[in-house]
Swiss-Prot record:
SUPFAM superfamilies: Ribulose-phoshate binding barrel. Pathway: Cofactor biosynthesis; pyridoxal 5'-phosphate biosynthesis. The active site is at 85 (schiff-base intermediate with d-ribose 5-phosphate). HAMAP family: PdxS (MF_01824). The keyword Lyase applies. CDD domains: pdxS. This is Pyridoxal 5'-phosphate synthase subunit pyroA. Keywords: Lyase, Pyridoxal phosphate, Schiff base. It holds the Pfam family SOR_SNZ. D-ribose 5-phosphate binds at residues 28, 157, 224, 245-246.
Length: 304
């Protein structure tokens, strides 16, 4: 990786912290009560924010980092890790989040971007970062900046999983192509370097992904996951875990749905368990059909 030895060592620690969330569900919460519900349901971590993506989308305006006092209240309410969101490129929001002691920082396209040229240089922070991606190029660029965890961008706040599926399938297909290049030639470097240029991704990270057959860091699903079936679908597509935003606390029975999604991620290969946990959950969030959305209303296109 393009970093000093110290930064590389720090990155190994941060990537290890992200690995600890593997196989888990991370839930958006807006207050201490929701955070406790998430913890009781078996969430691996919570994402503290003032408005879930569905409300950010509905209310409009500039979406910024949440009030630190609200984040601290959630941190005091639970024993599981707490994440919080900062705007793309807003390294001072990240400094504040690190100063109050959040466990992970999400440089998130759900908030209004603060910089149209640069993402945060995440190697400068001790806290591990999670970032979204739509494809392998975006994922590897974020990892090169220091992201210890990747998630699909999906289309947050819609309850429509189609974009998350597309982003995961795109990453999988692009890794498969890199792996095919690596395995089909006695000297794959020239072709792999050409593919890295095409993806606008660092060659060393592309080669690592090709060798491993997966991203070098954990890769979670996010954006539109609303049901246990959605969560299991993303796990079967190769995700390491799931973020659920508006899908839990915008549904009919939040406690029951939260537990069901945790169970679905744990037993994602068992249709009988999935059928059982999908019963009697009340109404799922009504949501928005992504195919009816205008391009300018899509959050996933934020970032580059």
């Amino acid at each position: 990786m393009a970093a000093t030895n110290g930064a590389s060592n720090d990155f190994t620690v941060k990537a290890g912290l992200a690995q600890m969330l593997k196989g888990g569900v991370i839930m958006d919460v807006v207050n201490a009560e929701q955070a406790r519900i998430a913890e009781e349901a078996g969430a691996a971590a919570v994402m503290a924010l003032e408005r879930v993506p569905a409300d950010i989308r509905a209310q409009g305006g500039v979406a910024r980092m949440s009030d630190p006092s609200m984040i601290k209240e959630i941190m005091e309410a639970v024993t599981i890790p707490v994440m919080a969101k900062a705007r793309i490129g807003h390294f001072v929001e990240c400094q504040i989040l690190e100063a109050i002691g959040v466990d992970y920082i999400d440089e998130s396209e759900v908030l209004t971007p603060a910089d149209n040229l640069y993402h945060v240089t995440k190697h400068n922070f001790k806290a591990p970062f999670v970032c979204g991606c739509r494809n392998l190029g975006e994922a590897l660029r974020r990892i090169s900046e220091g992201a210890a965890m990747i998630r699909t961008k999906g289309e947050a706040g819609t309850g429509d999983v189609v974009e998350a599926v597309k982003h995961m399938r795109t990453v999988n297909a692009e890794i498969a192509r890199a792996r095919a290049i690596l395995q089909s030639s006695p000297d794959p470097e020239p072709e792999l370097r050409a593919y890295a240029r095409e993806l606008e991704a660092p060659y060393e990270l592309l080669r690592e992904a090709a060798e491993k057959g997966r991203l070098p860091v954990v890769n979670f699903a996010a954006g539109g996951v609303a049901t246990p079936a959605d969560a299991a679908l993303m796990m079967q597509l190769g995700c390491d875990g799931v973020f659920v935003g508006s899908g839990i606390f915008k549904s009919g029975d939040a406690k029951k749905r939260a537990k069901a999604i945790v169970q679905a991620v744990t037993h994602y290969k068992d249709p009988k368990v999935l059928a059982e946990v999908s019963q009697g959950l009340g109404e799922a969030m009504v949501g928005i059909n992504v195919s009816h959305m205008k391009d300018e209303d899509k959050l996933a296109k934020r970032g580059w």
